[in-house]
Structures are given as structure tokens and as C-alpha cells.
């Protein structure tokens, strides 16, 4: 709730999917075994008509705003010892929790990381490669 957004529009809605029936329904839009093991999901949605647009270049900021809030959510889960994953390549046509005036941006599965989960080291570019100091 504390994430910033362009001109404080807060163009988001978060749908927490907890019940077994609802989870099974949601799993049809992203058919991966690891995804199906999550005890809950959060569908991160953007309000379609509440999108600040920068006048100079018509850049829309709704998706950016939802992304900022979603990452705050993921960081909060991590701080509590939970695992999360940003899923955006789901089949939107099979995402079956429509909310009038909202569109899904990402689905975040959240749960405890299995003890036998292979944790891959994150490959990140060097600071010098992504940052210029002027």
C-alpha cells in the first residue's frame, strides 16, 4: 500500500487467490508444475482508465505503477522468509478472474521455498555496465 505511483493514481488491484478451487482455476493460465505447488497467488491488476500519461511523449505509467507496487509486495514476502516469482507470460485468455475495468499485469505465486529447491545464483550485470556517474 505504500508504493509510489505517478500523481498518486494508485491504479492497481491485487486479487489474492487462496482457495483450492480458485487456485486450480488460475493454474490453467500458466501450466507449469512448479507454479502449481504455490499455496497462494496474487493477481496484480491495473485499472485501465486510471493511467497517468506524460504529456510530452504520451508515455503511459499504469504498468510501471503496478510493477513498483508488485515489487514492494515481493520484497515484503522475501523479508518474511517467503519465496515469490514474477509471472507475466501467462495466457491472458485463460486468466479467469475478470474485474471490470482492470487488466492483469502479473501473477505472483507466494509460498515457502522447498528445502530441496535448487537456488540458482542470480546473473547480474556489473555495476559499471549499467551505471554512469556524471
Predicted regions located by residue number:
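Glycine/charged-rich beta-loop-alpha catalytic/anionic-binding loops adjacent to active sites
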Residues: 23-25, 49-60
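Short, conserved aromatic-histidine micro-motifs
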Residues: 35-36, 94-113
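Arginine/glycine-rich "motif VI" loop of SF2 helicases in the C-terminal RecA-like domain
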Residues: 6, 78-79, 100-101
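C-terminal helix-cap and adjacent tail motif
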Residues: 105-134
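Short, solvent-exposed amphipathic alpha-helical segments in soluble enzyme
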Residues: 31-33, 58-60, 124-125
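N-terminal amphipathic, basic helical "cap/leader" segment at the start of enzyme domains
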Residues: 1-40, 46, 134
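Small-aliphatic-rich amphipathic alpha-helix that forms the alpha element of a beta-alpha
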Residues: 42, 57-97, 108
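Acidic, glycine-rich active-site loops and adjacent beta-strand->loop/helix elements
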Residues: 20, 48-49, 90-93, 114
Amino acid at each position: 500500500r505504500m508504493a509510489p505511483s505517478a500523481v498518486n493514481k494508485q491504479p492497481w488491484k491485487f486479487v489474492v487467490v487462496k482457495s483450492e478451487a480458485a487456485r486450480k482455476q488460475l493454474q490453467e493460465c500458466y501450466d507449469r508444475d512448479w507454479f502449481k505447488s504455490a499455496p497462494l497467488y496474487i493477481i496484480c491488476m491495473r485499472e485501465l482508465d486510471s493511467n497517468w500519461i506524460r504529456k510530452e511523449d504520451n508515455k503511459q505509467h499504469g504498468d510501471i505503477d503496478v510493477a513498483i507496487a508488485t515489487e514492494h509486495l515481493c520484497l515484503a514476502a522475501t523479508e518474511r522468509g517467503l519465496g515469490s516469482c514474477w509471472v507475466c507470460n501467462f495466457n491472458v485468455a485463460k486468466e479467469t478472474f475478470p474485474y471490470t475495468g482492470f487488466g492483469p499485469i502479473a501473477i505472483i505465486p507466494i509460498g515457502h521455498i522447498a528445502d530441496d529447491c535448487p537456488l540458482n545464483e542470480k546473473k547480474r550485470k556489473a555495476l559499471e555496465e549499467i551505471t554512469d556517474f556524471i
